Amino acid sequence: MRALLCAGVLLASSVFAATPEFAAVTPGHSISLAQDSGAHDGFRTEWWYATGWLDTPDKQPLGFQITFFRSATGHDPADPSAFAPSQLIIAHAALSDPALGHLAHDQRIARQGFGLAYAKPDNTDVKLDAWKIVRAADGHYEVTVDADGFSLHLALTPTQAPLLQGERGYSRKGPRPEQASYYYSEPHLRVTGTVVRPAAAGGRSKDGTVVTGAAWLDHEWSSTLLDANALGWDWLGANLTDGSALMAFRIRGRDGRAMWAHAALRNRAGEVTTFGRDQVDFTPVRTWRSPRTNTPYPVSMTVKTGALTWRLDPLMDDQELDSRQSTGAVYWEGAVRVSRDGADVGRAYLELTGYADALRIGRD
């Protein structure tokens, strides 16, 4: 879902090309790893999105989010100017630390080139200045982010096979078949590394904290925007304690109703159950109002997937992210606990967009 946050930047950059043409997302395409873990420059937008819960020696959990975006501008390749970018690289990083009480986050944006910013094909290798995510030959990821006020140096190691979303990786995002992406997830990544936490008084703490934990990585690429009547979306990626993995999302229309919805639940035996738009429901339980933007977010929700109901409660309420300096959106994105029938069953990340403002995603 997240690459659509790049739409505002992409549309603004379209001055470099009057009629850009991008590769189409079509059903029946076979995702091949590790080759498809790399960049797909022919498509309009792409992103690598890692989220997770971290355990610390003081038993105070943290949440983290790291995202790298690639956005094609449609720049005419016949223009020899090195300063007219064909690709933009954008990065977000955030740390949810209850001791701080609000989200610590940072963002970067740069044109691809000069070895300072790139997204390479064939294998995950994305860099923006000193921020990077690299997939090693054994499939694990090395992530380095030295941000304003905090840092994340993490290794993410697969413990399960990738989960192809939708129809073998072809993931519908709206009523028209071209409103789709190629999309796979890697749930239950084992996390090791160090985190420098933000200091409560500002700046950052001096010493790194050794952490372990579990993460979820999404990789998605597309050339189409959401339907023009879309207001925003709600997305969930959950690592469940029994080894299962749950992904669910809904696209909200301007009338408040779900325009599209989908969910996939893979059990610990590897069997996948999918749920269509009429089987998925997000229902607010409690809202929190941002003191900065006055936006009410449904930070506690129930999510129904068929006959199953999941309760989501945040690690902390204030996980609002302001990305107006890069992708142009303000939204809520944070660590949540997952329960069923009052029992703790997992850890997840929840993304809530279009509550501060309707997404200005343009028209196809």
Language model features: what each stretch is:
Residues A3-S14:
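Bacterial N-terminal signal peptides
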Residues R2-A3, G253:
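Short intrinsically disordered, low-complexity coil segments enriched in acidic
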Residues A18-D364:
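Structured soluble/peripheral alpha/beta segments that form catalytic or ligand/cofactor-binding pockets
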